[in-house]
């Protein structure tokens, strides 16, 4: 089975459309990929840390200083309490369960039996 390249056709003129003519200069600019994960939302540096946090922690431990956990920033989208399905990509609460927004991020478990 051979695969032929597909062509786009105009519905009005039934002529082949030049796909390169549809792109603007802004579309042609190669955008730099954003880093998906980093150490800012974790208690310790990642195993494969590339941001420099692992070196900083080792240096502080060698000097005898306490490594302080960074403060978790409040999310800007307002959906942090709803759960991962509603959180933005940079949410500091990714991976954590949904919580009641009025209880300072503490998780309330419903331990009652539903039978």
UniProtKB/Swiss-Prot annotation:
Disulphides: none
Entry protein name: Anamorsin homolog 2
Q: Which sites bind [2Fe-2S] cluster?
A: 39, 46, 49, 51
Key word Transmembrane present: no
- Required co-factors: [2Fe-2S] cluster; [4Fe-4S] cluster
Any GO MF annotation of the entry: metal ion binding
Sequence motif Cx2C motif 1, location on chain: 77-80
User: What's the domain of life for this entry?
Assistant: Eukaryota
UniProt lists the family membership as follows:
Belongs to the anamorsin family.
The record's annotation in Pfam families points to: CIAPIN1 (PF05093)
Principal subcellular localisation of the protein: cytoplasm
Locate the residues binding [4Fe-4S] cluster: 77, 80, 88, 91
Cx2C motif 2: where is this motif? 88-91
- What's written under domain? The C-terminal domain binds 2 Fe-S clusters but is otherwise mostly in an intrinsically disordered conformation.
* Annotated spans, Disordered: 30-115
Q: Does the keyword Disulfide bond apply?
A: no
Annotated compartments = Cytoplasm; Mitochondrion intermembrane space
**Assembly:** Monomer.
Name any Gene Ontology BP term: iron-sulfur cluster assembly
Q: Which UniProt keywords apply?
A: 2Fe-2S, 4Fe-4S, Cytoplasm, Iron, Iron-sulfur, Metal-binding, Mitochondrion
Free-text function comment from the UniProt entry: Component of the cytosolic iron-sulfur (Fe-S) protein assembly (CIA) machinery. Required for the maturation of extramitochondrial Fe-S proteins. Part of an electron transfer chain functioning in an early step of cytosolic Fe-S biogenesis, facilitating the de novo assembly of a [4Fe-4S] cluster on the cytosolic Fe-S scaffold complex. Electrons are transferred from NADPH via a FAD- and FMN-containing diflavin oxidoreductase.
| One term under GO cellular component | mitochondrial intermembrane space
From the UniProt entry, list the residue stretches annotated as the region Fe-S binding site A.
Answer: 39-51
Region annotation Fe-S binding site B: where it falls in the sequence: 77-91
Query: What's the source species for this entry?
Result: Trypanosoma cruzi (strain CL Brener)
